[in-house]
Amino acid sequence: MPERRRQSVYQPQRVRVRTDAVGEPTTVDAVAVEAIREEWLVEDRWWTPEPLRRRYFELVLADGRNVVVFREASRWLVQRA
């Protein structure tokens, strides 16, 4: 029987994000961003061949959801709990 790959519940998922001129999210999957509650930068594993650099945003969306999205390289992901 082939081994099935388990996907972690906490694994970030790709998301479509539009940004303004300074790189702050304005929409997430076509839902408007009402507010940016917090923004932070994580830089880790800088001593390895593959360092980690992510810019996180905690957002309030027009549909009432609170989400955390982050930019890593050239892609956006949403962090789900």
How would you name each of these model-derived features?
Residues M1-A81:
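Non-catalytic peripheral regions of nucleotide-handling enzymes
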